[in-house]
């Protein structure tokens, strides 16, 4: 996969994750993007070595949800 293809897949995954957050939590667009881009899940997603970018957005979202739930437990 070349860099342009990788970036396209990443953009599609982020778009889906943001949409899932908006649907599940009624977040404003900017807040949903902030949650995705500041997450450990996003760090793993953009690391080609993890292969996470090859998974479905729904599967990736499960990791993001676990991360978000873990943050709320510490509040």
What do these predicted ranges mean?
Residues 1-75:
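C-terminal alpha-helical interaction appendages
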